[in-house]
Amino acid sequence: SGTAAANYYPAICEANISHVPLVVLTTDRPHELRQVGAPQAMDQLQMYQNHVKLFVEMALPEATEEMLNYAYWQGAKGAAFAQQTPAAPVHLNFPLREPLLPDLERKTKSSQQTALFAGQSILSTEQVQQLADQWYQKNGVLVVGGSHTEEEAALFIQLAEALQWPLLADPLANIVTHGQNSEVVIAHSDLFLNVATLPQEPEVVLRFGSLPISKNIMLWLKRLATTETAFYFVDENGQWQEQLKKSQTVIQAKETTFVEQLLTVVKPTEATWLAQWLLLEKTVSEVLLETLNATELNETTASLAVHQTMKENGQLFVSNSMAIRYLDRFMDSRPYRMFGNRGINGIDGIVSTALGMSAVAPTQQNVLLIGDLALYHDMNGLFLAKRYQLPLTIVLLNNNGGGIFSFLSQRTLREDDFEPLFGTPLDLDFSLVAELYGASYQEVKTIAELKQILQTAAEEPQFQVIEVKGNRQENVHLYESILAEIGRRVERQGISWNG
């Protein structure tokens, strides 16, 4: 209740945008103690506003059959509402009078059960065929955002293969991680889109869900939206969350069912279309292999080491800001599951959410890749690992501040202005943080040392913090040098480079 309930706010906002079905229960003062100056009382009616899809002010409890039925029905209704498309949080607020404890010896009837039958949005066979006909022999691109399971990722890959279209995806879609046997998955498009001029432009863009994290994909699509390219947007949640606002066709259907329908009717386009993408992907992959293998331990190579040491079916939670971008730019295909909070893209609650991931599968390999600011923001979340003995390996990328702003226009400010406003150095000793919460701690100096610790942790899970100290300016220099080398090689292939 009170400010404790207010502390749920960031999680509820994230769950709303990420379409996580969450039931939030808060306690409250009874009505006669509200707005009269009673202690520990605040207005909790609609306290989460439009970030929840349902709010219920529960009745005061009574030990009657009618009230038990009421409580059951509101609980069932709340759980059902949370799961209905679009999935989102619901809030039930419970006012309580003293005595606050019920009669625990009192016998009550067994809880009733309510079965819920719900349909899903499905296109007709004629509608699916009409779309397939519109795409026949067209050069297209699949763009997939959002978070997906391995099975869902496999369906998107099958569709791209059936069409012979390149597939661009957000890292959390788990398409890159599970696309190791498919050439249609373009893992490194962020490093060439919007700067390399493709010999052919797509005639069709088929989008599923939110835009991927890549800014270059977004800018490229934004430019295409001013051309003759036809945009199709699959809107599973029926909310028209289309950032570009340029789609000529909106398809309201359950994504996986729609893809399964398409697989029965679509035909492949000419092989030359995919070939130009494969050439660019091959060029970028070669540059990354040569450059990063010759680079000492830093934030980028540490992120790749985490990626490369993930076991099949392992679980990696990736923080926002730079951690997710390192993987989006540089990772290749590996069969593990990646998680993150990409609804609002904030750094609140990253540690707690990662520990929730670990709690679901504590015997699996569980790793968190996080920066120092994000760890500091949710430091108290580490207590969950100690309290519930959750074996999470935390790889801390510590560049003493907010690294993302060193890649943005703010970096041109004077250091005296940049550091307190955007760099925001913490100067914290994280070995003491680890000690406080009962985690083992190691600072690593080499890639080999980091990989060895991660491989051991994969076989013998434990709660530990592995710190990699980095330098913000070095990260920017490495990124820019990689782009420059990619540009040189691409231009030698006769492709214009505007980087």
Residue spans for each PLM region:
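Active-site diphosphate/adenylate-binding microenvironment
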Residues: 278-363
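Structural motif
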Residues: 140, 204, 315, 365-367
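Conserved thiamine diphosphate
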Residues: 1-65, 70-72, 76-93, 98, ...
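Thiamine diphosphate
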Residues: 25, 32-45, 329-499
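Glycine-rich, anion-gripping cofactor-binding loops and their flanking helix/strand elements
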Residues: 145-232, 240, 333-363, 377-379, ...
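Glycine-rich, acidic loop regions that bind phosphate or pyrophosphate groups
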Residues: 26-73, 170-280, 467
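Structural signature of the thiamine diphosphate
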Residues: 17-19, 53-109, 197-226, 230, ...
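Glycine-rich phosphate/diphosphate-binding loops that line cofactor/substrate pockets in enzymes
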Residues: 79-86, 127-141, 159, 199, ...
